[in-house]
Amino acid sequence: MPEICRFYGIVIYMFFNDHNPPHFKVGYGEFEANILIENGNILNGDLPISKLKLAAAWAEIHKEELLKMWNTKEFHKITPLS
């Protein structure tokens, strides 16, 4: 499970052979959630709303890059929010 980004205590991962729809995993303390790349909504899991908003904003900025990683399975680090 490659870590692709980390910011404000949020850790973002993507699995190689995960199920559709395209999503990424977010960890924050004891919270974990799968976030849809398309719209930044929670697929399943739970996050504090402030961290969900940050993860969704980050995903919107990097949507095309995230979708490319999902489709090619070529993972790399992505610039965090600052």
Give a label for each model feature:
Residues 5, 14-15, 35, 58, ...:
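Aromatic-enriched hydrophobic runs in primary sequence
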